[in-house]
Each structure stands twice: as structure tokens, then as C-alpha cells.
């Protein structure tokens, strides 16, 4: 675990240990890995999610 599926380059060369929700840039940022968040109906869940680990979007973002 640790390589963000949407991350590349320097991030995957020195991957996060928090799963697939890391945010890349100058470094790997795992501050949102433990929460579910939505962006234009594209959700990502972290370690606090249950089940399949997918999100439901809309008026509220939640894990399903």
C-alpha cells in the first residue's frame, strides 16, 4: 500500500503509507487519506471508509 493510483513521478518514487488518496505535488501529502471527499462527483475514500471503500456524492459525501 501507499502508492496513490492518481499519483506519479516523485510521489510514487517515495510513496505515502496511507493508501491511494494521497495528493501529489512537491511531495506526497496524506492529510486527506483518512477521509472521504468529493470533487465534481469524483469521490475518493481513505482508511476510515468501510465496505468497498467507494464514495457517494451529492449534497453530502459519504462512504458506502
From Swiss-Prot:
Q: Which residues bind Cu(+) 5?
A: 38, 43, 45, 49
A GO molecular function held by the record: metal ion binding
InterPro entries, A to Z: Metalthion_mollusc (IPR001008)
Family, according to the entry, reads as follows: Belongs to the metallothionein superfamily. Type 2 family.
Q: What is known of its domains?
A: 14 cysteine residues are arranged in C-X-C groups. These are thought to be the metal-binding sites in other metallothioneins.
Instruction: State the protein's purpose.
Output: The metallothioneins are involved in the cellular sequestration of toxic metal ions and regulation of essential trace elements. This isoform binds exclusively copper.
Q: What is this protein called?
A: Copper-metallothionein
Amino acid at each position: 500500500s501507499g502508492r496513490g493510483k492518481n499519483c506519479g513521478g516523485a510521489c510514487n518514487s517515495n510513496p505515502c503509507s496511507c493508501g491511494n488518496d494521497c495528493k501529489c505535488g512537491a511531495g506526497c501529502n496524506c492529510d486527506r487519506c483518512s477521509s472521504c471527499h468529493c470533487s465534481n462527483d469524483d469521490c475518493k475514500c481513505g482508511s476510515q471508509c468501510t465496505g468497498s471503500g467507494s464514495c457517494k456524492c451529492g449534497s453530502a459525501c459519504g462512504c458506502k
